[in-house]
């Protein structure tokens, strides 16, 4: 690091599928890294006393809790934290502008107050879904077995459906937070709405079809889909795809609720280089620390510091719509919509989230395939998940 030339950083890359296994092996061998990226399992490491309580390090680093967005802390108790999200992402609607113009339909709204209802969204997806003869999904002669362009594709993990569930008054957990809540009426209906895009309206590909299709950016650029709902991390690939793309608010027209999310950097108590680890942390999480870090915050990531959402100059620094990964409407649809309507992300808040969500994701495959209704599948999986449910870290439903 040019800012700290006396600090030498040894990097280690671990594939995501092996990450936790490898990290646990290093810890068991007394060879834990000084600093590590981490997912929701970090809070258990905090409870086990393996990592520093970030609140205890704030003064040393010249930081304050108020420097960061209030919904972005990975806390394992009210006074103990693994730290704030390193770099934010959020769920968003991305689209191919040309598909909309060719279909003669209005572009997705970028302001929350103008957001489509779910029914309006489905109608738009029908108009944008085309068979090989050019008929859209609203046409009575539409051939659902020969589709060349889908109206929408979506990620099937929690980050996609939870904004809709939270906005509808549902939750990942039930109201008493002692069991899964995805089988509750409001939550199950949202999951069913997504499944119906595939199996009823035929505006989204089946799981088998989707597996044979490329990434979000490539699918949008190739006009295999007109819209895609998933994480903002896709913006870097969209920037490089050559696609004429845009972003809009999610199709939620009442009680718009969403979240920032992301992993974080943790510092292990076993480190012999605490001061150097703190400096590395500050360098990696400062959007203005270097050209490379700045580039990441202007394409792949979003900041976690509050000033980058409240100071107009700071907003423009990373979210100016003159930047290639920040299309027209980005500041309204992504920055403002998320900042104004964010709650704590489900994976940050729910205890034992990794273990629970592995079971939920497997059960949802039956929903996406149309073999079971959302209510059926989520009611069945409760028998496996509820022994893992221990509430939330905040004490509030998520």
Task: Describe each model-derived feature in a short phrase.
Residues 99-108, 131, 200, 270-277:
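Short helix-loop capping/hinge motifs at secondary-structure junctions, enriched
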Residues 91-95, 100, 165, 265-267:
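Short glycine- and hydrophobic/aromatic-rich loop-to-beta-strand nucleating segment
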Residues 2-68, 83, 98-104, 108, ...:
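Extracytoplasmic "Venus flytrap"/periplasmic binding protein-like
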Residues 13-22, 113-120, 206-221:
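Short helix-initiation/N-cap motifs at beta->coil->alpha
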């Amino acid at each position: 690091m040019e800012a700290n030339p006396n600090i030498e950083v040894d990097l280690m890359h671990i594939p995501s599928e092996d990450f936790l296994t490898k990290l646990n092996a290093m810890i068991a061998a007394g060879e834990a890294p000084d600093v590590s990226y981490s997912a929701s399992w970090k809070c258990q490491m905090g409870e086990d006393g393996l990592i520093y309580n970030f609140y205890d390090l704030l003064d040393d680093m010249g930081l304050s809790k108020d420097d960061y967005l209030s919904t972005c802390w990975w806390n394992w108790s009210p006074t103990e934290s693994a730290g704030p999200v390193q770099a934010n992402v959020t769920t968003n609607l991305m689209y191919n502008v040309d598909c909309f113009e060719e279909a003669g339909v209005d572009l997705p709204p970028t302001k929350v107050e103008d957001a489509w209802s779910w029914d309006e969204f489905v109608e738009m997806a029908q108009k944008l879904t085309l068979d090989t003869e050019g008929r859209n999904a609203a046409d009575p002669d539409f051939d659902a077995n020969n589709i060349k362009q889908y109206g929408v594709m979506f990620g099937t993990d929690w980050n996609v459906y939870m904004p809709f569930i939270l906005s509808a008054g549902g939750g990942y957990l039930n109201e008493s937070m002692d069991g899964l809540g995805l089988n509750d009426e409001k939550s199950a209906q949202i999951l069913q709405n997504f499944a119906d895009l595939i199996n009823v309206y035929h505006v989204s590909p089946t799981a088998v079809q989707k597996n044979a299709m490329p990434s979000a950016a490539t699918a949008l650029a190739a006009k295999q889909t007109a819209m895609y709902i998933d994480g903002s991390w896709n913006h870097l690939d969209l920037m490089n795809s050559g696609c004429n793309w845009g972003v809009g608010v999610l199709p939620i027209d009442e009680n718009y609720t969403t979240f920032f999310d992301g992993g974080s950097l943790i510092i292990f108590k076993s480190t012999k280089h605490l001061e150097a680890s703190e400096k590395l942390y500050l360098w990696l999480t400062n959007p203005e620390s270097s050209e490379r870090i700045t580039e990441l915050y202007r394409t792949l990531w979003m900041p976690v510091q509050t000033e980058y959402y409240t100071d107009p100059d700071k907003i423009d620094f990373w979210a100016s719509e003159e930047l290639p990964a920040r299309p027209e409407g980005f500041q309204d649809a992504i920055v403002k919509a998320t900042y104004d309507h964010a709650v704590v992300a489900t994976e940050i808040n729910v205890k034992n989230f990794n273990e629970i969500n592995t079971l939920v994701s497997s059960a949802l495959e039956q929903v996406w395939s149309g073999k079971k209704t959302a209510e059926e599948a989520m009611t069945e999986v409760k028998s496996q998940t509820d022994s893992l449910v221990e509430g939330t870290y905040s004490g509030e439903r998520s």
